[in-house]
Amino acid sequence: MAELERIDSRDRTDGMPRMKRLRQIPPEVGKFIALLAAAAPAGRWIEIGTSAGYSTLWLALACRAVGRKITTYEILADKAALARQTFAAAGVSDVVELVHGDALDHLPGDKDIAFCFLDAEKEAYGRVYEAVVPGMVPGGILIADNAINHQATLQPMLDRALKDERLDALIVPIGKGELVCRKK
């Protein structure tokens, strides 16, 4: 984790273009999502938007603690390759399945989702939300990153989630803002 934190810090200060940066969550958000994931009910764990795998490492720690596995989706080939290296180096490949491709190709009809962490291209959040929520188990948790710093782009999805009668939802001001939803 320390190496990815170092690279992320460097990329943010040296002007690396946004699409080439690792774009990972800060450590306190990693701890937060791992804590919530470990408390999720029985069912599948998924992550949408792997990047280099930093958030997945936090979730892998939770997987190990409670005997689960996670499937993570990354659409960009170079980031999927980097994530595979990250998982191998960290020794978590046994609890992480990386799928290179668009999560939206896999999510329709997906059932038994107990935990979902969403940190992908912001324009896709609404479609991902609509694909994930119907497949969530009661008590299932959906966390969407960047709910505060990308609020303008995410506002339609945020409004939908905060008013969705199937869920209890709120925005937690940690990191760049986390939308946390729990299925009723």
Task: Locate each region found by the language model.
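A short alpha-helical cap/connector motif
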Residues: 1-115, 122-143, 147-184
